Regions:
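Conserved alpha/beta-hydrolase "acid-adjacent" motif
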Residues: 208-215
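Catalytic His-Asp segment of secreted/periplasmic serine-dependent ester chemistry enzymes
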Residues: 239-245, 288, 318, 406-481
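Conserved SGNH/GDSL esterase-like catalytic core that processes O-acyl groups on lipids
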Residues: 164, 271-277, 282-369
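C-terminal catalytic histidine-bearing segment of alpha/beta-hydrolase fold enzymes
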Residues: 34-37, 217-269, 459, 463, ...
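Primarily recognizes the serine-hydrolase "nucleophile elbow" in alpha/beta-hydrolase
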Residues: 101-166, 182, 187
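Catalytic nucleophile-loop/oxyanion-hole region of alpha/beta-hydrolase
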Residues: 61-68, 81-117, 246-253
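Active-site segments of SGNH/GDSL-like serine hydrolases
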Residues: 348-352, 374-422
């Protein structure tokens, strides 16, 4: 029996080695207490996954929730990194910081490790699933993963509906008494529309340690409500902690489900033109189900094809005016838009600025110019000797396109079509002329003659109305791309 077991372990090790070109350990912290073991594939696809094993934030199950997965991923050309993160002992910033640094490190080493920095995912099990979902919902763009794989994840930090030990270890005994903290790190409450990465959740119906309904399913429900890309697989049995154990009856089915999901989420082409759409609720897709796909940026993506990657940075109710009641400048979406380093930026802001409590013509013009400056700062022109002169100019990228607001057919929420027509549009045209920018005149193009292009509030387009916007923007984009 012992000989058979040794033979099995030897064959398993040979399988991993056959698909793994390099295996090494990288320190995340100088003392090596946080580190990750890298498994680089023989034939890299460019995709990478950082793995967070579970263990209730008290220890790590690094085998069946870590190293045992290496051959599966390497066989698909996916670089795999098993993260040893430090335990929080009540300080949540410790494991969060380790994981965020691991993602940064993978992206920073992308060229050397043959990884596409826009195709770095995270995988987590149980408490590691909470950590993975926390980094997916609470991180800035540079260390937020591009997709999440969550196995029987702890999502809630309410000890009455999840694994109590994970809650106490992550937040601390005092933190558990803070309702604000409990809510903030119950990650179904932290899902960001358009910004939280696509996710797949895999759990068992009979999990008695981390109840699916108040955890994994709650995360799925939050993602679906926001119109984000999310898939949910609930297996009939398996309890908690099945991981990569081949003895689990649904092991092969689970691997097939995960493989199909990974294959259906292709990485963006490295040479794809990056497009950022910055706007208010009309860009966000207010009132449109599955707006990530059906709002005008999503429709634009479909029209453009895989030669482009279109990101939706719309936020409902937001203003261009910094002193408006809800300025876009304070939003994660704005920070993401800057960090994205787009090739093309489309700005569609002004509808909410027309409200009486917001409108200020002088400030609107100066804030529009400031936004352009932040997206594409002017730099000194160099002379023949390569030295800077007093003359300033903008770079060719990003190409900035301004959109006028669509008509406001009703004065809902105090929005004024008169202010839009007589004040906002002339300012947009003036700034565009001064800065040599293109304008998409949506106010003139938009057609609601049949009443099917606009929702009942008279402000927000329907899916059909958003189709008009997408096609109008497409026509301008085609001029140079």
């Amino acid at each position: 029996m012992r000989k058979l077991m040794m033979l099995f372990l030897t064959l398993a090790a040979m399988t991993v080695q056959a698909q793994t070109a390099k295996k090494f350990t990288v320190n995340i912290t100088p003392d090596g207490k946080a580190n990750m073991v890298a498994y680089l594939p023989e034939k890299p696809s460019g995709r990478a996954i950082v793995d967070c094993p579970g263990g209730g934030y008290s220890h790590l199950a690094v085998n069946h929730e870590g190293h045992d997965w290496a051959a599966y991923f390497n066989n698909q050309g996916i670089a795999f990194f098993v993260l040893t993160y430090r335990m929080p002992n009540g300080d949540r910033t410790i494991p969060m910081g380790d994981t965020q640094q691991a993602i940064r490190m993978v992206r920073d080493s992308a060229e050397v490790w043959q990884i596409n920095p826009e195709d770095v995912g995270i995988m987590g099990f149980s408490a590691g699933g909470h950590l993975a979902s926390t980094v997916s919902t609470h991180s800035e763009y540079d260390c937020r993963p591009n997709f999440s794989i969550l196995f029987y994840p702890v999502i809630s930090m309410n000890e009455r509906e999840t694994h109590k030990g994970s809650c106490v270890n992550f937040l601390g005994k005092e933190g558990q008494k803070d309702e604000r903290l409990v809510k903030e790190f119950s990650n179904q409450n932290a899902v960001m529309r358009h910004l939280t990465p696509p996710a797949i959740i895999l759990t068992a119906n009979d999990d008695g340690v981390v109840p699916p309904v108040t955890n994994g399913i709650a995360y799925y429900s939050a993602m679906r409500r926001q119109g984000n890309d999310c898939s949910l697989y609930v297996y009939p049995t398996g309890g908690h902690g099945f991981g990569f154990r081949s003895s689990w009856p649904f092991h092969d089915q689970m691997l097939n489900d995960l493989t199909v999901w990974l294959n259906s989420h292709k990485a963006p082409r490295k040479d794809a033109v990056r497009v950022a759409c910055i706007g208010n609720s009309i860009t966000d897709g207010h009132g449109i189900d599955m707006s990530d796909v059906k709002a005008w940026p999503g429709q634009l993506q479909k029209l453009l094809g895989d030669g482009y990657v279109v990101k939706n940075y719309g936020r409902s109710g937001r203003t261009l005016l910094q002193k408006g009641d809800q300025p876009i400048w304070k939003e994660q979406a704005w920070r993401d838009a800057l960090a994205y380093k787009a090739d093309v930026v489309i700005i569609k802001l002004g509808t909410n600025d027309s409200k009486p409590q917001n409108w200020d013509a002088q400030a609107y013009e100066s804030d529009l110019r400031l936004m352009i400056d932040q997206l594409n700062p002017k730099v000194p022109v160099l002379n023949k000797k390569g030295k800077p002169t007093k003359k300033m100019q903008r770079s060719q990228k990003p190409r900035i396109i301004l959109c006028t607001p669509v008509p406001a057919y009703k004065p809902s929420w105090g929005i004024s079509d008169s202010v839009i027509v007589n004040n906002i549009i002339p300012i947009i045209n003036k700034v565009a002329l001064d800065e040599h920018l293109e304008v998409v005149d949506l106010h003139s193009i938009f057609d609601n003659a049949d009443g099917k292009a606009m929702q009942g509030d008279g402000i927000h387009p329907t899916e059909a109305g958003d189709s008009q916007i997408a096609k109008a923007v497409l026509e301008i984009l085609k001029i140079k791309h």
